[in-house]
Amino acid sequence: MTKLNSYETLYIVKPELTEDSLAKLIESYQGLLLERGAKNIITQNRGRRTLKYMIKKYKDAHYVQMNYEGNGEVIQLLERAMKINESIVRFLTTAI
């Protein structure tokens, strides 16, 4: 059995997404993590915040934080899914 490391992924979502669309987006990423064997998934919607500087012509955006345990393969799949999703403005994954 492979060792699971703890990770935190923070992603910034376009402000024009509705609450329902944002909830579906969050659920899809949680489902992706669960399918690939991630454990202890904790997701926090940090709400809509003003950005310190403009990112892709946006002054504010929704912040979502996910903490979970997984392996490197899970991180690669999650980040690949975020790269192709046009609703994601920016994301960052760190080991904790």
UniProtKB/Swiss-Prot annotation:
Q: What GO terms in the biological process aspect are recorded for it?
A: translation
Q: Which Gene3D superfamilies match?
A: 3.30.70.60
Sorted alphabetically, the keyword list is: Chloroplast, Plastid, Ribonucleoprotein, Ribosomal protein, RNA-binding, rRNA-binding
List, alphabetically, the SUPFAM superfamilies matched.
Answer: Ribosomal protein S6
Signal peptide coordinates: none
Localization terms from the record = Plastid, Chloroplast
Q: Look up keyword Transmembrane helix and say if it applies.
A: no
Which GO MF terms does the UniProt record name? small ribosomal subunit rRNA binding; structural constituent of ribosome
Q: What is its main location?
A: plastid
Is Flavoprotein among the key words of this record?
no
For this record, an example GO cellular component is: chloroplast
The record's annotation in InterPro entries points to:
Ribosomal_bS6 (IPR000529), Ribosomal_bS6_sf (IPR035980), Ribosomal_S6_plastid/chlpt (IPR020814), Transl_elong_EF1B/ribsomal_bS6 (IPR014717)
The record's section on PANTHER family has: MITOCHONDRIAL 28S RIBOSOMAL PROTEIN S6 (PTHR21011), SMALL RIBOSOMAL SUBUNIT PROTEIN BS6M (PTHR21011:SF1)
Q: What is the similarity comment for this entry?
A: Belongs to the bacterial ribosomal protein bS6 family.
Q: Which HAMAP family match?
A: Ribosomal_bS6
**What NCBIfam families does this protein map onto?**
S6
State what this protein does: Binds together with bS18 to 16S ribosomal RNA.
Q: What is this protein called?
A: Small ribosomal subunit protein bS6c
Annotated organism of origin: Guillardia theta
